[in-house]
Amino acid sequence: MVVAPIPYGFGSYPADWLRSLAALRAHPFKLLIPGHGAPQHDRVYLDRLSGLIADIRSQVAPLAAAHLSYDEARKKIDLSRERRLFAGDDPWLGLWFDQYWAEPFVKMAWQEANGIPITQGEG
């Protein structure tokens, strides 16, 4: 659920993920050990990740309502601010943000907004 510094967007369920992050945020933890990344002593990254998911969903929703195809919608999604927030100027983190987060997660958000089932794996 929490991977840092770049989250993985493959096979995600955006609305469920956002609800799960909210539940985790409400839990009175003192230390959060993410699936990848340094231990966290606060909720800063949780808030950043929740904001990222919410922003993508809010950009995708009107495009889905306008019946844009995934390819058409993807061209209209602007993640430049989020990319800077998560990757900074690091070229590797930028590449990982694009490949591991932006491409798969925007597709999952588009599928969710269009009522298309999100499946895990090949079968």
Identify the meaning behind each predicted range.
Residues 1-55, 59-62:
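Metallo-beta-lactamase
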Residues 65-123:
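C-terminal regulatory/interaction regions
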